[in-house]
């Protein structure tokens, strides 16, 4: 099983998403953050699950419209960004 590593930028994206949704519903923000984190962490079991976005970067659509971008190297899954699909 691979290990999942979060970049500081991906963690900042997760925080920004949670903060934005939290303006409207703190409970929904907490649930969305948990769903995104759980989906990213699940890549430890199936790292090739996401579609290829570039030659090395993969992406996993979690909860439309959010996309987790990551790459796999040396037994590690590097979570690079979590973006709204309109901002890709």
Curated annotation (Swiss-Prot):
Pfam families: ParE_toxin (PF05016). InterPro entries: RelE/ParE_toxin, RelE/ParE_toxin_dom_sf, TA_system_RelE-like_toxin. Belongs to the RelE toxin family. It comes from the Bacteria. Toxic component of a type II toxin-antitoxin (TA) system. Its toxic effect is neutralized by coexpression with cognate antitoxin RelB2 but no other ParD or RelB antitoxin. Keywords: Toxin-antitoxin system. Disruption phenotype: No visible phenotype when deleted singly or as the relBE2 operon. This is Toxin RelE2.
